[in-house]
Amino acid sequence: VRDTATKALVVLLASRPELASALWLRFKNLDDAYVTERLVAAIYGAAMQGRWSANGLFFVAKDLHADLFASVDFPANILTRDHARGLVRYAESQGVLPEDFDSYLINPPYGSAWPIEHITEEKIESYERDEITRSTVFDGDFARYQLDYAVNDWSAAAKLSGPIPTARDLAQRWFDTFCITASPEMLAAHRALLAVMSEASNDSYWTLRPLIDKAKAAFRAAVGEQVFAQWSAEASNWYQTGMFQGAVHLRDEPAQFNLAWARRWVCKRAHDLGWSEALHGDFDASIRNDRHTHAVERIGKKYQWIALYELCARMTDNLQPLPGRDEAGDIMRLRNIDPSLLVTQTEDDGWRRFEEASFWVPPEPDLKPVAADQALDWLNVNQD
């Protein structure tokens, strides 16, 4: 439904740049990132149809550039940014932008807020394992197949901060800060927790899980919710606590950003955006739970996506990628529509035979049968 509505809007705007400007003016401050993201996508797709005049394209690009890239209220939504950047780059490629146009502002990073806040156990427990919490914090499909893959290329190090620290370095840094204000009781609880966890390798963790959970509970009680949340995010062996996709498990290699922290942040952010079991639980439960069909989307899934797009934008702006990882890879994985492509299906159902080539069924190569020795000779030819 959402994709169909987006492309229907592309069709409406394809020859109406003035309507695109009017719609943007009316809805640009709407407090719903899901709507504004697709409005920008539709405007971008409409421009890409190539039917706007040079002046029309310029004024639309200028408006979005001023509101999204030159504004102090730049949206922390990685897809909204991507569509808007595409629109300005398209206008630039068409030669409609003046020489003094600040097109450099469209290039990331954009300076969103960092770091994300620590999320306490008390806050997660207050959600009572509702749909959002199960889906994100407790190894649900969204966490494992969407969230983890969207953020697992990022390290724990800020941009321009020098070499990426190891997980062991981060734990030591946290401990040094902890020692400044920790009481003897806090330090004793921390030592007891480390003693239990040092016995737990990846293979024995689940065997020792009851002892580890008991030591964690004692440490949490001793240090309080906020310090325990900081320890969980910055110093714990977080990858042992769930089924994380593509996680780096070595403490002496460049530290990956804590995926458990990312999951918890998305969970809280989705609730902060407005989702609740009381308001939306019954409706969401009535929607078929199938990640491969998209006829109607659960409201909770909408808020999860908004939170994830915000997290990805903030990580892209502020963190170094892990060695060998590509910063552009994240946005490629998250793109979910090509707003310029209006064809929904073709005549080809997989069974029909077409006499003439078309743009979706290219001509078949005419390969004449040849003897085996001729084929082998052809393999060694260096020319077409």
Where are these regions (language model features)?
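Alpha-helix N-cap/helix-start positions at coil->helix boundaries
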Residues: 32-37, 78
